[in-house]
A protein has these predicted regions:
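Charged, terminal alpha-helix-loop-beta segments
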Residues: 1-184
């Protein structure tokens, strides 16, 4: 039997306390505010040398594409603020050249996603991940990633792509599993 999370904050608290165990990510900060945006959780991927933004959702009435590209654009246009946040929170000395901005991504975590949300990230190269989280009556937790089934690139969309997608697409590159395991 699954038991619902009462608040989005409950999901956030659980994940932030376990970013290393769940995603092999180093927790940096919670509720990072920059300009008019507030990022739920900021993490750093030590293996890929990149920042990862985690957003939590309890409802199904939001666009992951709009929010994801807005946050990646915010990051890429304010790199020094992200490095400063890391250095101040981790008491470290990360430099701009130490970060692979092209590997940055946004993870969305929710008890469920609707069909439109799942289809919106159904491209091989969008830097977004959807993870469904469930809590069971025996206090067990499950996290399941929605896997893209498409080989289509978002870069192949015809017509006017929004400038934010173009700008982020120039800097962020999603690596395939085949590329990831070459040379390892």
């Amino acid at each position: 039997d699954t038991t619902p999370f009462n608040l989005e904050k409950d999901i956030q608290k659980l994940v932030e306390g376990n970013t290393e165990e769940f995603f092999s990510l180093e927790f940096v900060s919670s509720e990072f505010s920059l300009n008019e945006f507030r990022i739920d959780t900021l993490c750093f991927d030590e293996e890929n040398k990149s920042f990862v933004i985690i957003e939590y959702k309890k409802g199904k009435s939001y666009s992951v594409i709009d929010q994801g590209y807005s946050y990646l654009s915010l990051m890429l246009n304010n790199k020094s603020d992200f490095i400063l946040e890391y250095n101040e929170c981790k008491k470290n000395n990360l430099k701009r050249g130490d970060v692979d901005w092209s590997s940055s991504k946004v993870i969305f975590i929710s008890p469920s996603f609707n069909t439109y949300q799942k289809n919106s990230v159904n491209f091989q190269d969008v830097p977004f991940e959807l993870w469904e989280i469930k809590k069971y009556s025996n206090n067990m937790i499950s996290l399941n990633q929605h896997q893209s089934s498409s080989k289509e690139s978002i870069q192949n969309l015809e017509g006017d792509k929004s400038s934010i997608i173009k700008d982020v697409g120039k800097e962020v590159r999603v690596v395939s599993e085949d590329e990831l395991f070459v040379g390892k």
